[in-house]
């Protein structure tokens, strides 16, 4: 299914599509989620590219909790992110009285239909039937700064720091853009621009949904990807201000509402708090990402 060809919501009575058929009475949730609990690479301290049983169980439970009429999932190219989405989509609750339209079916649900052959030519890293997005990928070369950030976090803990070690590692990342540049790691601001690109695209997509759509778009990414983006939007200096870094499986959500007159409101929801957002700020950040990608060509 093409990126902009979402047939969510109330379909037009005829095959002729008119402007008034789209972008009215829309309820959409754009979910940006850290993948569920992964294994651990003991040599580097980084996440291994698979989910633990705990992570798999949590993904299944998240899928069962989905209530929107239509849902679609995207993920980082990493398997642990794809598996998180795959398990969610494969466990969306349906019954004769209530049905959720899962736009991209999981690999398991394709077995025996012949459609599973579509996956035979996928690269190994694209193991699941999930649309991957490079903007959601893990921060490249983060392993190069992990020893420095980890050592700093240990020192902070010895000094009585209240945050957990992982949150302190993310805090070091946010506070040291120059060290990141020296090690070939994207800065927090650059990482924020990647997530902004995905958010900007999906905010635009909501305006092209059929009228009366109730949709959830799931985007599974990594730590620390969401925290720098949150810092740009919310303006905190220390992660303690928002309760620490995101834990495995934790999300931020954009609640999008478009009324019958195409007036759109967007709120950022995180840890039982609502934050107003500036779409222009998100678009500007996204443009930085696009300019950076264009500069590589």
Where are these regions (language model features)?
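Active-site beta-strand/loop microenvironment that shapes enzyme catalytic pockets
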Residues: 217-229
């Amino acid at each position: 299914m093409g990126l902009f060809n979402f047939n969510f919501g109330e379909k037009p009575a005829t095959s002729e599509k008119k402007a008034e058929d789209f972008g009215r009475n829309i309820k959409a949730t754009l979910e940006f989620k850290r993948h569920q609990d992964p294994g651990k690479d003991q040599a580097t301290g980084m996440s291994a590219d698979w989910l633990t049983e705990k992570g798999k169980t949590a993904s299944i439970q998240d899928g069962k909790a989905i209530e929107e009429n239509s849902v679609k999932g995207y993920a980082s190219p990493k398997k642990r992110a794809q598996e998180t989405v795959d398990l969610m989509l494969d466990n969306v609750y349906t019954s004769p009285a209530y049905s959720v339209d899962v736009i991209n079916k999981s690999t398991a649900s394709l077995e025996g239909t012949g459609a599973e052959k579509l996956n035979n030519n996928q690269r190994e890293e694209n193991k699941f039937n999930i649309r991957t997005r490079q903007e959601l990928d893990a921060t490249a070369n983060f392993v190069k700064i992990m020893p420095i950030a980890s050592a700093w976090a240990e020192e902070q803990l010895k000094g009585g720091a209240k945050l957990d070690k992982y949150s302190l590692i993310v805090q070091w990342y946010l506070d040291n853009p120059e060290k990141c540049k020296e090690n070939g790691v994207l800065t927090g601001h650059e990482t924020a621009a990647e997530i902004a690109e995905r958010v900007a695209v999906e905010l635009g997509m909501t305006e092209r949904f059929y009228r009366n759509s109730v949709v959830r778009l799931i985007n599974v990414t990594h730590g620390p990807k969401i925290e720098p983006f949150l810092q740009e939007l919310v303006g905190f200096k220390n992660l303690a201000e928002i309760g620490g870094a995101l834990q495995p499986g934790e999300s931020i959500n954009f609640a999008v509402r478009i009324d019958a007159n195409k007036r759109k409101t967007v709120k950022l929801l995180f840890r039982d708090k609502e934050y107003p957002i500036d779409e222009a700020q998100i678009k500007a950040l996204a443009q930085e990402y696009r300019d950076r990608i264009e500069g590589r060509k």
